């Protein structure tokens, strides 16, 4: 089967529209979701900039299936929204700000994602001059998700592709950091 014609499904109800991978990658955020930005309490110029950037989002190239836990979603990421993630010591310090007294053994994927998702929302907020809470809302509104790359960056990518584990189960930053911090492993980034 041609990868482009696969219709992602399952995994928490992704892709209710029944779009093919090729269609999702060419237009990651469908027009009916982009129109929802008009209903948000945002300055018109912010909505206009977001729509212009979302119009540039996407690629005719469908990401290759995960290989050895690695995926490359960069071609379908929100243009211009990226941030570096902290190295091990910086991550531990940030987690301990959220969870004072936490032992290294008690650090989990969730406590790591609390930091990475904040960084991702902040990157979007900074780009458009909106609040971090509003940035998080918009990511969900547009059916996108924060993806941590295995080279320690965040990207905002289509949920329909990111959660399509049959092709894209991956281990990235969260898995790498968890193993460095306490030796634990996760089977997939979303666990």
Each language-model region and where it sits:
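Nuclease and nuclease-like effector domains acting on nucleic acids or nucleotide cofactors
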Residues: 2-145, 149-191
């Amino acid at each position: 089967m041609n990868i482009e014609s696969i219709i992602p499904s399952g995994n928490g109800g992704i892709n209710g529209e029944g779009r093919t991978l090729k269609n999702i990658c060419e237009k990651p955020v469908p027009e009916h979701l982009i129109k929802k930005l008009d209903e948000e309490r945002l300055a018109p110029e912010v909505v206009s900039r977001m729509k212009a950037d979302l119009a540039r989002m996407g690629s005719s190239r469908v990401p290759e299936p995960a290989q050895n836990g690695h995926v490359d979603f960069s071609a379908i990421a929100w243009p211009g929204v990226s941030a570096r993630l902290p190295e091990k010591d910086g991550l531990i310090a940030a987690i301990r700000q959220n969870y004072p007294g936490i032992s290294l053994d008690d650090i989990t994927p969730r406590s790591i994602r609390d930091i990475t998702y904040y960084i991702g929302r902040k990157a979007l907020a900074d780009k458009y001059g909106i609040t971090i809470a509003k940035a998080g809302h918009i990511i969900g509104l547009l059916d996108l998700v924060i993806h941590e790359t295995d080279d320690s960056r965040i990207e905002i990518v289509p949920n329909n592709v990111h959660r399509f584990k049959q092709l894209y189960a991956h281990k990235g930053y969260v898995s790498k950091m968890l193993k460095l911090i306490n030796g634990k492993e996760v089977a997939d980034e979303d666990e």
